[in-house]
């Protein structure tokens, strides 16, 4: 006659990032804190830029839900967004849209600020390590091709030993290879 009420177990409502590093979580926490500060200060440009960053990061998390996300992923993502802003600036300059150029430059400055705050090696440090590696390879094998140079690097340890993203190292190898060989 009377039915017993089913107990509903509470579920976790928040999203827990099991596959991410501590510095990745700290960077996201800093972005959210800065978003709150921008909202309180009514800084529309900074607010929309940070929201765009958080949206892009969330999309990356969805795309790579089974992979570990780290500061190097954020570095690559920020670098991609900065290059998009640079392309937009050249387009706006060609079309004489100075107002949009100023907006894109300001957004690019905000993104560069967050990129420089990440605990990764600078471009100069990466270039010096790549240059030294390529010089050592040239002494051993003077007729080395670029494809073979990529094979000589242990890509699994680039993040931990070089403190750099593999994409940044690859770009540096392409740039430095022409100078050395």
Swiss-Prot record:
Record key words, sorted: Mitochondrion, Transit peptide
Transit peptide in keyword set: yes
Transit peptide: 1-18
Keyword Transit peptide carried by entry: yes
Pfam family, one: YqeY
Compartments reported by the entry: Mitochondrion
Annotated gene: AIM41
Originating organism: Zygosaccharomyces rouxii (strain ATCC 2623 / CBS 732 / NBRC 1130 / NCYC 568 / NRRL Y-229)
SUPFAM superfamilies named in the record: GatB/YqeY motif
GO cellular component term, pick one: mitochondrion
Protein name per the record: Altered inheritance of mitochondria protein 41, mitochondrial
Any one GO molecular function term: carbon-nitrogen ligase activity, with glutamine as amido-N-donor
Family designation: Belongs to the AIM41 family.
């Amino acid at each position: 006659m009377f039915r017993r009420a089913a107990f509903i177990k509470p579920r976790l409502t928040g999203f827990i990032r099991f596959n991410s590093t501590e510095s990745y979580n700290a960077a996201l926490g800093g972005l959210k804190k800065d978003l709150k500060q921008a909202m309180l200060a009514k800084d529309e440009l900074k607010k929309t830029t940070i929201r765009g960053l958080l949206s892009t990061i969330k999309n990356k998390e969805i795309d790579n839900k089974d992979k570990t996300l780290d500061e190097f992923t954020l570095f690559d993502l920020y670098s991609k967004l900065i290059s998009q802003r640079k392309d937009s600036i050249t387009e706006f300059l060609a079309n004489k849209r100075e107002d949009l150029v100023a907006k894109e430059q300001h957004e690019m400055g905000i993104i560069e600020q967050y990129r420089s705050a990440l605990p990764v090696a600078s471009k100069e440090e990466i270039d010096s390590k790549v240059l030294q590696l390529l010089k050592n390879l040239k002494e051993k094998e003077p007729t080395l091709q670029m494809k073979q140079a990529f094979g000589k690097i242990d890509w699994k340890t680039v993040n931990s030993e070089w403190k750099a993203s593999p994409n940044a190292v690859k770009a540096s190898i392409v740039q430095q290879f022409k100078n050395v060989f």
